[in-house]
From Swiss-Prot:
Pfam families: PolC_DP2_cat, PolC_DP2_central, PolC_DP2_N. The keyword Nuclease applies. Possesses two activities: a DNA synthesis (polymerase) and an exonucleolytic activity that degrades single-stranded DNA in the 3'- to 5'-direction. Has a template-primer preference which is characteristic of a replicative DNA polymerase. GO terms for biological process: DNA catabolic process; DNA-templated DNA replication. This is DNA polymerase II large subunit. Belongs to the archaeal DNA polymerase II family. PANTHER family: DNA POLYMERASE II LARGE SUBUNIT (PTHR42210:SF1). The keyword DNA-binding applies. The gene is polC. It comes from Methanococcus maripaludis (strain C7 / ATCC BAA-1331).
């Protein structure tokens, strides 16, 4: 019985997934019962909803049903508090006081975070009941580093939950001493100077106020090897080191999220938090700036000229504060010629992913590939690059001084080597939902065809769709004149980017030309040596009007709208503007002037240009540990640095390591639960140091698999898990045979960048029509039967489109699973694939590294792009958006058969990125709430565009927009989601970012600055300075410091903080080597100084580099010994 609202078709889809999950679970469980694995059962519990996930990850037992009841009646946050109260009251079993309090806090936090992230497990080390100096008892919550994965709001609510638990247990408030209060301030300062900066920088008084007023102690375990110097050895603080988890909960939780805490406090009626109101009022402006990045708008309003008002928006410079070497800046903040803001959503955008014309992706020398992350100016901090070919492409000036609109990929490839300057980068397509999510003011929309069509509809005017999409220039002008409507966006130039005086200079030059009937163009004289003509030519470039230069002749083929816009009647061959100087004098600005001289209304083409720089490149690669290994079978140092067990066997080597083992009755040492020598069931007693019988286990494994000779098999040196229980060697051999690698938990994974897609064409995913029909894709978005590969289909929410390289890797994984079934478990092969396409329809798990819950998915095809396409709901189910992060896929049967909790490292964070529970059916209500703000409309109403000019808050127009939130708990929550802009191919554009193909850092920075040089919206000198200041200088200084503090290591793996007195390894006697080399210290020195000279960096930067150079030379250059050439002696 499904617990979600869904149509008949979607119900059948979910039933099919559940049946397949059950089939795989049964098969894996049957294999496990053979006794060859760590346990006799599959170790991944299945969860149908959030309540099951919470019980599966943190418990207590039988809590799931009560969570469902409370969430249904009260809502998520009140339910979390109530379940915490019931736990400490003993309704789910008798716990000790501290154990009960800890269980209550963990369970409540798990409810708040939907039972997905690892924070309830790993982010809370423990909860203790401690004593104040007056002997009263209070509650202390020990936070750890992984609490970060919960997010600021959940961190703050964890403290609120702790206070609620404290009250219900009848405990006193935490009463800190002055030393303890000041300790927090010292730790915050030290954390920011030595570790990393917080999202919010609190003042000392705010920290003191919070610590004195919060009723529970926010403390934690040491997370960083940095000690306080002032407030040390405090009786109630167990460490002198920084407590990173506690600081995160205090600063990015309570202090940063104060307004949200107050809303919950008021809503839930919790007392004792009134002190936050004063803190909120003092810091509200700063907090809003961080959370909302609200802009300042300045208007100059005058009577009936308001439509021509000057519009300014304050540039947001935060994204460009740090520029990484080799990663270009595409546009400086709000710089003219940058990405023009356009509203809407394509089938492959939304949920923090923005659309760009694929042509610009090629013109920036392939630095924008499909899936490349960009750090952006607004509305959010980052986005992912995807192609949308229905928006405006770039405008470029060629080396012959001609100007072209590059509106196709073919043109981009044809002219890419001839581009001298990119005058306009094209549109950035951002959906309303991203503004709503970031609570960012709705900025004025660009003048676009969808707005234009809305105006024509509102005035009940007749038009053809072809006219909206691609009108003839004369048709566009005459339609505007006849209907008194604004000029079509296609022929609306960037008049606002030049002054009205510039417009007049351009006008005088243009109307002085003549019509060339032979090629239907307008010709003007061009002389690059003439300053006046050169200036006029530049103005023509800046407004984005295409033209061709041939010798001393400049031809304009879009002459009709240009001439009329400049007040020249082409048909009558006359200037229709009278008293031009008076109009120049009396008009308010450029847009007022151009509208005064033109016979029709001309709208402002762009209000907002968005700045952006490259973040990280796209990724699609198999997950490998460092170094990569085939199995979790430890061999110590017997395999040398390459860790090859077959080499150790050949050379007769072994090693003594700590491992779980037991002496079997047959006389042999068994490392498994079933003795490989006699078949008896044994139970390893626990870890102890033994001399590993590598040779015996190797040949026994080959015998079991009926393999005469295996190739290279890489193994680990030792287990980091608590019990040191190992994986059977047979699995390592079979993985190596199939060229795949293992992760820490026994699974084999593939990582790729998250990209959303709600609709696809069969041709894009390399799957036949009949196969898609068998997977439930019967009709396209228009209700027509699926018949050809170009029809658009709506993606089902748990279906994924993986990269082509992922299919190849999973093809090998499936061969490994089948070999494992046949050769090791003596079962029938399951996948039986002959080619990668045979994997279509099989189930996988999708998982983010900061979580402990996986989501079942189904492969329905693969794309050429190096990204993982999935429904926005699917990404949200992993607590991810799509701003450039990467997650993992792995085959479901692989996880069921090979995953074990007992392989996981016994350290803080060890249980993160492990499928401790698996969600089988995706419920949109229980995914990350950000996706609820994504709009799901087929078109935006005209009111949206009109209201955008007013600079209003996104919530003010939510009633006229439709978002995912409006569809929840209805059958339509899974189907019928719309999009406003079409794109021909979701994987059009460069597939590999240039950053990944270039070699040395010198090559990368040269390419980075070459891109900056040819983009009008970018200043290459500023880019060079920022690269040096924000990347090279900190790296050089950091490496210098690391060199002076470094330890030494040995080839056997031993590491020493200081050189031993003997001067050799105490373990094996070998020579010790440095961990930081000279090359690592000075690797950026030469490139930094070369850049500083070439791009004329400031004297300050040059001098700073000289100081660093002298510091490096003082370490590595001997002033007393100088190498000379033989001829120097004859001088």
């Amino acid at each position: 019985m499904l617990h979600v609202s869904a149509s008949k078709g979607m119900t059948e889809y979910f039933k099919n997934i559940l049946d397949n999950v059950t089939e795989l679970y049964t098969l894996a469980d049957d294999c496990r019962k053979s006794g060859y694995d760590v346990t006799d059962h599959v170790e991944i519990p299945l969860a149908k909803d959030m309540a099951d996930r919470v019980e599966g990850i943190v418990g207590p037992k039988n809590v799931a049903e009560r969570i469902r009841e409370l969430v249904s009646d009260l809502g998520k946050e009140p339910a979390a508090l109530e379940i915490a109260k019931e736990i400490v009251e003993g309704k789910f079993g008798e716990f000790g006081r501290e154990v009960g309090a800890e269980q209550a806090v963990r369970t409540a936090l798990a409810v708040i975070t939907e039972g997905i992230v690892a924070a309830p497990l790993e982010g809370i080390a423990h909860v203790k009941i401690k004593k104040n100096n007056d002997s009263g008892e209070y509650l202390a919550i020990y936070f750890a580093g992984p609490i970060r994965s919960a997010g600021g709001t959940a961190q703050a609510l964890a403290v609120l939950v702790g206070d609620y638990v404290r009250k219900n247990m009848g405990l006193d408030k935490f009463k800190p001493t002055e030393d303890e209060v000041e300790r927090y301030g010292e730790e915050v300062d030290l954390y920011q100077s030595e570790v990393t900066t917080f999202q919010y920088q609190p003042k000392a008084e705010e920290i003191r106020a919070a610590v004195r007023n919060i009723s529970v102690e926010i403390t934690g375990e040491a997370t960083d090897d940095v000690e306080v110097s002032g407030h040390r050895d405090l009786p109630r603080v167990e460490t002198n080191q920084i407590r990173g988890g506690a600081l995160l909960a205090l600063v990015e939780g309570v202090l940063l999220k104060a307004p949200k805490i107050l809303r919950h406090v008021d809503k839930l009626g919790i007392e004792g938090w009134d002190w936050l109101k004063e803190l909120k009022s003092k810091k509200e402006e700063v907090i809003e700036e961080i959370e909302e990045e609200k802009d300042d708008f300045n208007y100059e309003e005058e009577e009936d000229l308001s439509q021509y008002e000057d519009y300014e928006v304050e540039a947001v410079t935060k994204f460009i504060g740090e520029v990484i070497a080799g990663r270009p800046v595409f546009s400086h903040p709000s710089k003219k010629g940058g990405f023009r803001l356009r509203y809407g959503r394509s089938r492959n955008t939304g949920f923090a992913t923005d659309g760009f014309h694929p042509a610009i992706m090629y013109l920036v020398d392939d630095f924008m590939a499909v899936g490349t992350q960009l750090k952006t100016e607004r509305p959010g901090k980052a986005t992912c690059v995807v192609p949308v070919d229905s928006i405006e492409g770039p405008i470029v000036r060629l080396k012959d001084k001609s100007v072209l609109k590059i509106d196709t990929v073919e043109k981009a490839k044809q002219y890419r080597d001839d581009v001298e300057e990119i005058l306009f980068l094209g549109d950035i397509l951002v959906n309303y939902g991203d503004f709503l999510e970031n609570n960012h003011t709705i900025l004025p929309s660009s003048w676009c065809t969808e707005w234009y069509e809305k105006i024509l509809k509102s005035e009940n005017l007749e038009y053809k769709k072809e006219f909206i999409e691609n009108p003839d220039q004369k048709e566009a002008v005459n339609y505007a004149k006849l209907t008194k409507t604004p000029l079509h966006p296609k022929y609306t130039y960037f008049w606002h980017d030049i002054s009205k005086d510039n417009i007049n200079v351009l006008r005088n030059w243009i109307i002085g030309g003549k019509y060339n009937e032979s090629n239907d163009s307008w010709e003007v004289t061009y002389d690059s040596e003439n300053p006046e003509i050169s200036n006029a030519k530049r103005y023509l470039e800046l407004i984005g009007c295409p033209h061709t230069v041939t010798g001393e002749k400049l031809e304009i083929f879009e002459y009709y709208p240009l001439l009329y816009s400049l007040g020249y009647d082409f048909d009558e061959k006359r200037d229709i503007v009278e008293e031009i100087e008076e109009k120049l004098q009396n008009t308010k600005n450029n847009m007022h002037f151009i509208n005064t001289i033109a016979p029709f209304e001309i709208r402002r083409n762009a209000y907002i240009y968005v700045g952006a720089r490259m973040g990280r490149p796209e990724k699609a690669a198999s997950r490998k540990m460092k170094p990569p290994v085939n199995g979790l079978f430890p061999i110590g140092n017997a395999g040398a640095l390459v860790r090859l067990i077959n080499k150790a066997v050949e050379e007769g080597k072994t090693d003594e390591i700590e491992i779980s083992n037991v002496k079997c009755s047959c006389g042999n040492v068994s490392l498994y639960r079933t003795c490989p020598f006699c078949g008896n069931s044994v139970e390893p007693s626990g870890p102890s140091r033994i001399k590993l019988p590598i040779k015996e286990y190797w040949y026994k494994a080959l015998e079991n698999l009926k393999i005469n000779k295996a190739g290279d098999v890489k193994c680990i040196k030792g287990m980091t898990s608590k019990d040191k229980i190992i994986e059977p060697l047979e699995k390592a051999i079979l993985r190596a045979k199939n060229d795949i690698y293992v992760f820490k938990d026994g699974t084999t994974r593939f990582d790729c960048t998250d990209v959303p897609v709600t609709h696809f064409r069969p041709v894009e995913i390399h799957v036949g029509i009949e196969k898609l029909k068998s997977l439930g894709y019967l009709k396209d978005i228009h209700g027509n039967s699926l018949e050809n590969e170009d029809q658009v289909l709506e993606l089902k929410v748990q279906d994924v489109i993986v990269p082509e390289s992922c299919m190849d890797y999973f093809f090998n994984v499936s061969k490994f699973i089948d070999d494992l079934l046949e050769k090791y478990y003596k079962k029938d092969r399951f996948y039986n694939v002959n080619k990668r396409d045979d994997l279509v329809g099989h189930l996988i798990i999708g998982m983010a590294p900061h979580t402990s819950a996986g989501m079942v998915g189904r492969i329905i095809g693969y794309s050429n792009a190096n990204v993982g396409y999935a429904h926005p709901y699917f990404h949200a189910s992993k607590r991810r958006n799509c701003d450039g992060d990467e997650d993992a896929f792995f085959l479901l049967l692989d996880a069921f058969m090979n995953f074990s909790k007992r392989f996981l490292p016994d350290k803080r964070g060890g249980q993160m990125d492990a499928p401790l529970v698996l969600t089988t059916i995706l419920d949109p209500k229980e995914v990350d709430g950000e996706v609820h703000n994504m709009d799901s409309m087929w078109e935006y109403p005209i009111e949206f565009y009109e209201k955008s000019l007013e600079g209003i808050a996104p919530k003010e127009i939510k009633k006229i927009m439709q978002t995912v939130e409006d569809r929840l708990d209805k059958d339509s929550q899974y189907e019928g989601i719309g999009y406003t802009h079409e794109t021909l191919k979701i994987d059009e554009g460069p597939l590999v970012c240039a950053y990944k193909t270039l070699g040395s850092m010198m090559e990368k920075t040269s390419a980075q600055l070459a891109v900056a040089k040819k983009i009008r919206a970018t200043d290459e000198r500023d880019v060079a300075e920022k690269v040096i200041q924000s990347h090279f200088v900190p790296d050089l200084i950091g490496n210098l410091r690391a060199f002076s503090r470094q330890g030494v290591r040995c080839k056997c793996g031993a590491k020493y903080r200081r050189m031993p007195l003997k001067g050799v390894c105490r373990k094996c006697g070998s020579r010790l080597i440095l961990t930081v080399s000279k090359g690592a210290v000075e690797k950026y020195m030469d490139v930094s100084q070369t850049m500083a000279e070439k791009y004329e960096a400031s004297d300050y930067i040059k001098q700073r580099l000289e100081i660093i150079r002298s510091g490096i030379d003082s370490l590595f250059v001997n002033d007393k010994r100088k190498q000379v050439k033989i001829e120097d002696f004859f001088k």
